[in-house]
Amino acid sequence: MPDFRLAFRPFREQMAFFERKVNVPSTRWDDIRLGDHAHGFMVAGAIRAALLDDFRNAVLRAQREGRGLAEFTREFESIVAKHGWTGWTGEGSAKGRAWRAKVIYQTNIRQSYNAGRYAQLTRPAMLAVRPWWEYRHGERGYSRNPRPIHQSWHG
């Protein structure tokens, strides 16, 4: 797996996007619909404010300091133990816990990176010199299971 610390170095627009998000307690991943995910920070099943704050701060530190998944996973385990968080998908096994930490880490870092890049690419000065985009899917090898629709947009 690629080392995301090399690919996702934080930049101003990325951090601004993540820092604007507000904590949103949720019981399931689909409690929040469509574009609302862009404005709220949520972890499915995390309904207590202190738990959500700790997860958010862990993601924020991971972005600011370039922490990798292994470091984030250790912090995830510590947060879960500290709050006695139970009843979440993946809880019952080491593989499940690793999966859940990875989902939280990668989703938030990728989303903020993409939103930050979009902010950069849609500046009027940038659009004046690059008025169109070309979709290139998976050239860096991050997507091991690409969606057919994404592959169809390539090029």
How does the language model describe each region?
Residues 1-155:
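Domain-core detector
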